[in-house]
UniProtKB/Swiss-Prot annotation:
The EC number(s) this enzyme carries: 6.3.2.13
Main localization, broad class: cytoplasm
A Pfam entry, by short name: Mur_ligase
Compartment annotation: Cytoplasm
Protein name as annotated: UDP-N-acetylmuramoyl-L-alanyl-D-glutamate--2,6-diaminopimelate ligase
Residue numbers of N6-carboxylysine PTMs: K218
Keyword Transmembrane set for record: no
Function in brief: Catalyzes the addition of meso-diaminopimelic acid to the nucleotide precursor UDP-N-acetylmuramoyl-L-alanyl-D-glutamate (UMAG) in the biosynthesis of bacterial cell-wall peptidoglycan.
Organism name: Clostridioides difficile (strain 630)
Residue sites binding meso-2,6-diaminopimelate per the record: R379, D403, N404, P405, R406, G455, E459
């Protein structure tokens, strides 16, 4: 593709060099540069792409999009105000606007994104659709699974995956949309048919200045949709978003339990086998069952059903899809054993998510609840004491341990968590080493007790310093169970 075509729509300050040249690759990572690459220099949080211009030239880069003046001859330099923002436009142009050619469903919110996109994928597949998936656990391009390094990829990678999905015959993509991706322009040129909002609770406040800034980032998604928006109206953040978008020329549907909504759940029954409820929609009522317990399952499935309604998925298809769903890896996932105890692994890493999984556990636990949790390092510190208070309140015993400490000292993170603990009570314990914490929890469990290990879920690593070490909560739990 000609460089001149790729840069259409950019607000260019100046150009040095030739625009009528062939470009066969677009990159922001100098390690992926090949001959004929257009290299976009991004000023990131850790490094600055402008520092890698000479390296990119040595690897064959032909042209650059920059924010700074560059005194190098022999290549084309296009100066713009914001390279990160323009990267989304360049990527969309280079791959010929792939998201306009199939149905992209975007799901945003603090919790529930992975569950909703996964269940939607299952139902649409049952409906004989071919579906791509983009999210926290993995990317699926219609043919193969790809390791996911973030909830929502950078715009170049995102458009690349969209293009592959089209090539592989996908007619849908169910996609998690993070607040970071909305704030950092990753999805600026994505054509969303449908937007879904789950909930808003404190998270990522190391990146967003406050909860309102976080909410506003999420809200951006719903001004990008062309078919419909679906909002959790029970959530305070959802109420604000609904008020702000209800006047736009895109239908908005609501779902909830406590507030009158287009899609509501009544007569909710939850036990260890799953959850059932009476579904009330704009045109019919129906009894729904899904073999995953908890109120979070009720909300997630209401969002899914609303999406199916908008997309015209037949009722028997989505009912069967919900009935057959096995949930999501690392989301309230049971570790099978014959020891008479329940061991559950869950990704809950926010106060709201931890409270939800522990309350759900209380609904069916016949014995004691032993929880294992920590908080990630180099991330929002405000949630740490909240997590401590919640873990202690809803557990018979909570074991506070390490999560992904990153560059912080684990003991310092745990000290923050302990700020929320009532020291007068004796139902808490600190075990810094996560493997030892899991082992201790399982060894203490008696018949009918529940051990719930939270924070990492599907993750198969632990980040200590800047290094990822292999660590899998399920593997560790299985090893501990085998020694009982």
């Amino acid at each position: 593709m000609k460089l001149n075509d790729i840069i259409q729509g950019l607000d260019i300050i100046n150009v040095k060099g030739e625009l009528n040249i062939d470009i066969n690759n677009v990159q922001y990572d100098s390690r992926k540069v090949t001959k004929g690459t257009l290299f976009i220099c991004i000023k990131g949080f850790v490094s600055d792409g402008h520092k890698y211009i000479k390296d990119a030239i040595e690897k064959g880069a032909s042209a650059f999009i920059v924010e700074e003046d560059v005194a190098i001859k022999g290549c084309t330099f296009i100066k713009v105000k914001d390279t990160r923002k323009d990267m989304a436009k360049v990527a969309d142009n280079f791959y010929n606007h792939p998201s306009q050619k199939f149905n992209v469903i975007g799901v945003t919110g603090t919790n529930g994104k992975t569950s909703i996109t996964t269940i939607l994928n299952e139902i649409l597949t049952l409906n004989k659709n071919k579906v791509g998936l983009i999210g926290t656990i993995k990317i699926f391009d219609g043919e193969k699974d790809i390791v996911s390094n973030s909830t929502t990829p950078e715009s170049i990678d995102l458009q690349y995956h969209f293009n592959n999905m089209l090539d592989n015959g996908c007619d849908y993509c169910a996609m998690e949309v993070s607040s970071h991706s909305l704030a950092l322009n990753r999805v600026d040129e994505t054509d969303f048919k449908l937007g879904i909002f789950t909930n808003l609770t404190p998270d990522h406040l190391d990146f967003h200045k406050d909860l309102e800034d976080y909410r506003k980032a999420k809200e951006k998604l719903f001004f990008k949709t062309t078919m419909a928006n679906i909002i959790n109206i029970d959530d305070e953040g959802g109420k604000k978003i609904y008020e702000n978008i209800k006047g736009i020329n895109v239908p908005c549907y609501t779902y909830g339990v406590d507030t009158k909504a287009d899609f509501m759940a009544r007569d909710i029954k939850s036990d260890s086998d799953g959850v059932s409820y009476r579904l009330i929609t704009p045109s019919y009522e129906e009894v729904i069952f899904i073999p995953v317990p908890g109120m979070f399952t009720v909300y997630n499935t209401l969002a899914v059903i609303a999406a199916c309604y908008v997309l015209g998925i037949p009722k028997p298809i989505y009912k069967e899809g919900l009935r057959l769903s096995n949930g999501v890896s690392g989301r309230f996932e049971t570790v099978p054993n014959d020891k008479g105890i329940s061991v559950i692994v869950d990704y809950a890493h926010t106060p709201d998510a931890l409270e939800n999984v522990l309350k759900t556990t209380q609904q069916f636990a016949e014995g004691k609840i032993i929880s294992v949790f920590g908080c990630g390092g180099d991330r929002d510190t405000e949630k740490r004491p909240l997590m401590g208070a919640i873990g202690q309140k809803y557990s018979d015993l909570c074991i506070i341990t390490s999560d992904n400490p990153r560059t912080e000292e684990p003991e310092a993170i745990i000290k923050d968590i302990l700020e929320g603990i009532d020291k007068k009570k004796e139902n808490y314990h600190v075990v810094v080493d996560r493997e030892q914490a899991i082992a201790e929890a399982i060894s203490m469990a008696k018949k009918d007790d529940v051990v719930i290990i939270t924070g990492k879920g599907h993750e198969t690593y632990q980040i200590i310093g800047k290094v990822k070490h292999h660590f899998d909560d399920k593997e560790v739990a299985n090893e501990c169970l085998s020694k009982m």
